[in-house]
């Protein structure tokens, strides 16, 4: 059978793209081809088609205008890390923390799976830009998919459509991203609301800068511009070209005097990343302003001024719904007022959405994420724990005025976070770039609130699932960046989750984290006092702004900042990962670890800020 025509619009000039689409049509055998233009009319048409097919449920126009609910197949609710592959030419370049298959072998497997995989479906061609259009840091990709769900989500999450193709001239490079739900339809066969396949592959070819995803419909596996391109492929590109692609939020911090800084922060799962990106300062800290640039990914390069400059490559927010509320993140809730797609949350009788912790008291009746009746106390969640929202970033009430600036934003500080009930203080500053890189490389979180130290999960730079090459080479690349940037960002480590012996959190968190952020900005500009500790530079009690938090005594602060000699156990917990990476581990890491261990051994058994220093100035 002859392949159908690709029907490329006149404004498509890129020869490589035209040839790739022709080859993909011949392989996948779709019934038709649609070149996505990114228009409102196209989005509305696809949403209406999915409502008619049962994939989407239109929410109340009064409660949630122009928004939709989608329920996935129960087997397709999250990223599939065990089916995610880095197919570098050499196995050792993927490293021991990634799954690897030889490229030739993987391509043979994928070729069989993709043969005829789009029969009975429409093939959509989605041109998109990861970053503001025209930015020298932005990168263009093209995703081919047979899922209208992917198209509508990509329109929210990326700058996509005709405007991107008009930037892609005849010889311009782009990253090809191929996706299929893996569920071809025979003539007359009825479709299902959420087509997918049990055989899943999420594959990256770093040398070719190419991505292939098969059989999943879940956003994290199908919105290929996000983790697949902007982190796994982009991190590999960044290593080769001398820049950084990181799993980090970006926020703006403006002082009452009008001094503006930009900060990037890496938070592992369940550490409050989106909440921090949209933090609201306490009312007593009048004049301080926080703006959001992005909540998940940043790309940056060195500027002529010797600093790192960054962009948010995304156009929307793809966030976890449960736990998001007017208490925890009012700015996020305001962002979700309209024009959103919700996946696997619960449906209220009046046509709105609900998820756990959204309100203090759950509704009396819901339809849960699997379409079943739900009432309080029925012993199952109303929303899936990994249920998601996709929302336009432009709707965020504190979006930074320069968030789409193609000239990029200078970064003053990096923050790396963990979730630890003990050992790690509230905040400290690394003494130098190399030490900061080591601390970021060994950052960890407890798997549960009651987990023992042995259950700590080490997640370097919050990049363990997303680094597209050997993690040891990744550490070396970070050290190299520090050697080439004349004015690098200052590096800080935070832990909002330190507890008392009875299990209560010592730090209030949420908006009060602004007090720590203010101290950091003072350190960046050489104004805030600090004390040298076994781990780095720490704030004195009087260095933080305590207005509105009068009950937080210096004694309580001392406990929050203390360092036990048991901290050496934290260093021992790093061994498993570092031994895995030993053949490419930076030599500096061995020396830094020994120096830290020696410092902890020689420190008092229980190190605390000395009270007599509280009033001293550095």
Curated annotation (Swiss-Prot):
Subcellular location, in the record's words? Cytoplasm
Q: Does the keyword Cell inner membrane apply?
A: no
Q: Where is the active site?
A: 271
- Pathway where this protein functions: Carbohydrate biosynthesis; gluconeogenesis
- Could you tell me which SUPFAM superfamilies the record lists for this protein? PEP carboxykinase N-terminal domain (SSF68923), PEP carboxykinase-like (SSF53795)
The entry's protein name is Phosphoenolpyruvate carboxykinase [GTP]
Segments spanning the bilayer are: none
| The protein's role, per its UniProt record | Catalyzes the conversion of oxaloacetate (OAA) to phosphoenolpyruvate (PEP), the rate-limiting step in the metabolic pathway that produces glucose from lactate and other precursors derived from the citric acid cycle.
Per the UniProt entry, what species is this protein from, by scientific name? Chlorobium limicola
Q: Which cofactor does it need?
A: Mn(2+)
């Amino acid at each position: 059978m002859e392949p159908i025509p690709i029907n490329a619009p006149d404004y498509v000039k890129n020869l490589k793209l035209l040839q790739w689409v022709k080859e993909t049509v011949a392989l996948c055998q779709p019934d038709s081809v649609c070149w996505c233009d990114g228009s409102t009319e196209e989005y509305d048409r696809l949403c209406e088609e999915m409502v008619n097919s049962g994939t989407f449920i239109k929410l109340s126009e009064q409660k949630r205008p122009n928004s939709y609910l989608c329920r996935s197949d129960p087997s397709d609710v999250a990223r599939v890390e065990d089916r995610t592959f880095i197919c570098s030419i050499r196995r050792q370049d993927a490293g021991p923390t990634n799954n690897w298959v030889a490229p030739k072998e993987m391509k043979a497997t994928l070729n069989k799976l993709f043969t005829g995989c789009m029969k009975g479906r429409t093939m959509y061609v989605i041109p998109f830009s990861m970053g503001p259009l025209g930015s020298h840091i932005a990168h263009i990709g093209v995703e081919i998919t047979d899922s209208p769900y992917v198209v509508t989500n990509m329109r929210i999450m990326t700058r996509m459509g005709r405007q991107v193709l008009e930037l892609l001239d005849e010889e311009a490079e782009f990253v090809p991203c191929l996706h299929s739900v893996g569920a071809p339809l025979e003539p007359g066969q009825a479709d299902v609301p959420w087509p997918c396949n049990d055989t899943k592959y999420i594959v990256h070819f770093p040398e070719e800068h190419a991505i292939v995803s098969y059989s999943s419909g879940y956003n994290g596996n199908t919105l290929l511009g996000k983790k697949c391109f902007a982190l796994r492929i982009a991190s590999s590109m960044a290593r080769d070209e001398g820049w950084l692609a990181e799993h980090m939020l970006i926020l703006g911090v403006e002082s009452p005097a009008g001094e503006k800084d930009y900060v990037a922060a890496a938070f592992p799962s369940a550490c409050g990343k989106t909440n921090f990106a949209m933090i609201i300062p306490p009312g007593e800290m009048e004049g301080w302003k926080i703006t959001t640039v992005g909540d998940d990914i940043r790309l940056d390069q060195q500027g002529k001024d010797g600093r790192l400059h960054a962009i948010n490559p995304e156009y929307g927010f793809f966030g976890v719904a449960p736990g998001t509320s007017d208490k925890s993140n009012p700015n996020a809730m305001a962002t979700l007022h309209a024009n959103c797609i919700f996946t696997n949350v619960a449906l209220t009788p009046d046509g709105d959405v609900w998820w756990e912790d959204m309100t203090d008291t759950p509704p009396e009746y819901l339809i849960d994420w699997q379409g079943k009746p739900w009432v309080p106390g029925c012993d199952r969640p109303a929303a899936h724990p990994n249920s998601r929202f996709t929302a336009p970033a432009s709707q965020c009430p504190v979006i930074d005025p320069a968030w789409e600036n193609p000239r990029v934003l200078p970064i003053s500080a990096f923050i790396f976070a963990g979730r630890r009930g003990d050992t790690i203080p509230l905040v400290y500053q690394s003494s130098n770039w190399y030490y900061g890189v080591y601390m970021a490389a060994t950052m960890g979180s407890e798997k549960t609130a009651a987990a023992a130290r042995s259950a700590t999960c080490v997640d370097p730079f919050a990049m363990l699932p997303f680094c597209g090459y050997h993690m040891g080479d990744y550490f070396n690349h970070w050290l190299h960046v520090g050697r080439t940037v004349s004015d690098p960002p200052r590096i800080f480590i935070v832990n909002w989750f330190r507890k008392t012996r009875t299990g209560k959190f010592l730090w209030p968190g949420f908006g009060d984290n602004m007090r720590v952020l203010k101290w950091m900005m003072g350190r960046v500009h050489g104004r805030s006092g600090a004390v040298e500790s076994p781990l780095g530079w720490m704030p004195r009690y009087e260095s933080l702004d305590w207005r509105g938090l009068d009950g937080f005594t210096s004694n309580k602060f001392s406990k929050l900042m203390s360092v036990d000699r048991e901290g050496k156990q934290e260093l021992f917990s790093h061994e498993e990962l570092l031994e895995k990476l030993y053949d490419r581990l930076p030599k500096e890491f061995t020396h830094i670890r020994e120096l830290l261990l020696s410092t902890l051994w020689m420190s008092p058994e229980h190190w605390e800020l000395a009270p007599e220093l509280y009033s001293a100035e550095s």
